[in-house]
């Protein structure tokens, strides 16, 4: 019993000791940063996954499923390909003299005129697309001795047989087809594009019926180039009731140059020229609908916002677009390292500083103070250090966007079958570029995240050191981001520490006196906890012993009977 009384006395003495921050002559001031219950994982140079309070997604991985008609001028090809619109297919007459920033070709587009081929289809398509216009100027060519404006039932304009509106099909007049020699100088100050063709009859009889000669020849020349085409007579697969074909060619005539056309048959002559423009217009294959909205960046999937530096929607883009990368997600840290707050603070509910954990619920700043003094507890943010961190983090996203956004469009790459090896090489180069950009993007984001975390940690340390320099010997660093202040420090005193007007000399004598008095009797918190738990355990043990002794004594006296049945 004496032991029990002694342990109880020790327990009471321990509880009676003044705890840091609980007495009238001391106070506790802790520094900390805000935290959230569930942070965001980001990647840094040193860590694959580190939790931060805030992060911004840098990869745009979905489109609007529609193409915006602003600020770019979009021309919907509908049922027409760009080449059909160029040649003047009857069902594409609405496209004459049209202009565009982006010509959108649809999968439903079809040709509905004389069957033709373009030996270098992709180059012509790209040339017209980049010009951004179908502006056409008619010219008076002198085709003496032949019949003009040939037509076909395979190319109807309304109920009548017709032909491509930008081409002039020449055939014999009477029973003659003389040698044609026509010149057309370019006296203007811009490039002129002439489209012409060669007719390939399906039989020798068709050849002589149209052109008299058994074999024709077409030569088109400028000072810089010459093309000579001999028709290839023979049957081909039937298309719209015809087994003959037309091959389409083009010639660019520079200012001061001259166009010369020589032919003794099979010529599909130009009616004029297309005025060439230089610009950043382009063409894209897409079935996304065109709608009234605004977006700088367009992909075949639809328009996408360009407020992120990277995108994973499509390699092919037009406009000011995010850089294409392989990653579906890259997160940029825009907050500090997140250490969720511990819900329990030990047996006495003490406050803790940033070294132990962050503080949830601190919404008015990133860094701040918590205190316990004779007037109670309180919390306030430190706006200066918060603003210093925010100022350095703000603009990170914009700087990354500036470094990575495409200023030009990434066009479709197409090659003919003859250029298969070039196509393979181009694909390899494009894939390598994407791999490099994907790696660079990941490295760039990891570096920025490392910098953000280091700088936010640095601001916390700066605030802690600033507070330490103010308090000097008037307080003791408790090792957890808190200071034990050895003098009476009311709310006004705490506020002076926060705003940097604290005068340590004013409290120096009181602090030294209290420090010596408290140190003389204070048990270190670690030993105090041990004594508390040990005394509690022994007290419980002795209580059990006393209770068991009482039961045995009662059994001996007959006051308690215990029956054991088997």
Curated annotation (Swiss-Prot):
The chain crosses the membrane at residues 531-551. One of its GO terms (cellular component) is viral envelope. It is a single-pass type I membrane protein. GO terms for biological process: clathrin-dependent endocytosis of virus by host cell; fusion of virus membrane with host endosome membrane; fusion of virus membrane with host plasma membrane; viral budding from plasma membrane; virion attachment to host cell. Keywords: Clathrin- and caveolin-independent endocytosis of virus by host, Clathrin-mediated endocytosis of virus by host, Disulfide bond, Fusion of virus membrane with host endosomal membrane, Fusion of virus membrane with host membrane, Glycoprotein, Hemagglutinin, Host cell membrane, Host membrane, Host-virus interaction, Lipoprotein, Membrane, Palmitate, Signal, Transmembrane, Transmembrane helix, Viral attachment to host cell, Viral envelope protein, Viral penetration into host cytoplasm, Virion, Virus endocytosis by host, Virus entry into host cell. Palmitoylated. In natural infection, inactive HA is matured into HA1 and HA2 outside the cell by one or more trypsin-like, arginine-specific endoprotease secreted by the bronchial epithelial cells. One identified protease that may be involved in this process is secreted in lungs by club cells. Residues 17-530 are extracellular. The keyword DNA repair does not apply. Residues 1-16 form the signal peptide. It is found in: Virion membrane; Host apical cell membrane. The record marks 345-346 as: Cleavage. HAMAP family: INFV_HEMA. Homotrimer of disulfide-linked HA1-HA2. Binds to sialic acid-containing receptors on the cell surface, bringing about the attachment of the virus particle to the cell. This attachment induces virion internalization of about two third of the virus particles through clathrin-dependent endocytosis and about one third through a clathrin- and caveolin-independent pathway. Plays a major role in the determination of host range restriction and virulence. Class I viral fusion protein. Binds to sialic acid-containing receptors on the cell surface, bringing about the attachment of the virus particle to the cell. This attachment induces virion internalization either through clathrin-dependent endocytosis or through clathrin- and caveolin-independent pathway. Plays a major role in the determination of host range restriction and virulence. Class I viral fusion protein. Responsible for penetration of the virus into the cell cytoplasm by mediating the fusion of the membrane of the endocytosed virus particle with the endosomal membrane. Major glycoprotein, comprises over 80% of the envelope proteins present in virus particle. The extent of infection into host organism is determined by HA. Influenza viruses bud from the apical surface of polarized epithelial cells (e.g. bronchial epithelial cells) into lumen of lungs and are therefore usually pneumotropic. The reason is that HA is cleaved by tryptase clara which is restricted to lungs. However, HAs of H5 and H7 pantropic avian viruses subtypes can be cleaved by furin and subtilisin-type enzymes, allowing the virus to grow in other organs than lungs. This is Hemagglutinin. It comes from Influenza A virus (strain A/Swine/Ukkel/1/1984 H3N2).
